[in-house]
């Protein structure tokens, strides 16, 4: 779980070197569960309210979705810690909820977006407006993926929810990858796998890669070597954005 541009694909590239563990791409499983749950608001369900049978379907979503995957452990990427999602998972996952939370300061996330869409004409934020300010405000809208993940992270940080979570700062993942990854294995209570932290592979899981033609080329392209660098595009963030979102830090 993380805001976009926070190291999701990087973490997955490293973790997926282990043939027994799968760290997924953006997952639709929570959306499936949400859509099934909201069938309770339809006239058909309200006319015949079989909660138990619908609950059986909800409880089978993860098991059925991943039943043909060869890995023993699946790290499903999604906003698991929003209030609604957490309630659904605790009731229907069938095992304790464990969530790896990647964190990157908000302005660094937005600077990463700027670097991408200023250099990639096909990037989807370029449809949001002509100026950087317009594009960033649109990216931060309440219904977008950044805000949804941010709400999920804020909920994860509540004292009563922290026991479900392992927090990773983006900077630690890049500068100290081995102890950071080791910590995630301890959290998952599984044996450590000797990972490679150079010559990294682009994301490909079970023979499937991202199709970035949908959202803009190179959205999920990672650097093959780990190196923490200052992003010069951070200087291009408008003051209006800094004033509204600059306080969002861990």
List PLM regions with ranges.
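PAPS-dependent sulfotransferase catalytic core
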Residues: 1-62, 68, 203-207
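C-terminal/domain-terminus segments
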Residues: 31-35, 173, 246-250
């Amino acid at each position: 779980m993380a805001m976009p541009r926070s190291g999701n694909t990087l973490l997955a590239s490293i973790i997926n070197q282990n043939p027994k563990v799968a760290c997924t791409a953006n997952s639709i499983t929570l959306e499936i569960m949400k859509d099934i749950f909201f069938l309770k608001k339809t006239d058909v369900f309200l006319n015949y309210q079989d909660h138990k049978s619908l609950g059986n379907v909800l409880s089978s979503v993860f098991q059925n979705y991943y039943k043909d995957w060869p890995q023993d452990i699946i790290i499903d990427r999604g906003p698991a810690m929003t209030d609604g999602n957490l309630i659904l998972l605790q009731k229907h996952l069938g095992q304790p909820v464990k969530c790896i939370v990647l964190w990157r300061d908000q302005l660094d996330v937005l600077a990463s977006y700027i670097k991408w869409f200023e250099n990639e004409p096909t990037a989807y934020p370029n449809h949001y407006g002509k100026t950087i300010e317009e594009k960033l405000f649109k990216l931060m809208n309440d219904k977008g993926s950044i805000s949804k993940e941010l709400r999920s992270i804020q909920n994860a940080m509540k004292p009563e929810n922290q026991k479900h979570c392992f927090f990773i700062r983006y900077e630690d993942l890049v500068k100290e990858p081995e102890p950071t990854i080791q910590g995630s294995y301890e959290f998952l209570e599984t044996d450590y796998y000797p990972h490679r932290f150079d010559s990294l592979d682009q994301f490909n899981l079970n023979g499937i890669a991202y199709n970035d033609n949908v959202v803009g080329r190179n959205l999920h392209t990672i650097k093959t070597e780990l190196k923490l660098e200052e992003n010069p595009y951070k200087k291009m963030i408008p003051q209006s954005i800094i004033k509204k979102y600059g306080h969002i830090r861990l």
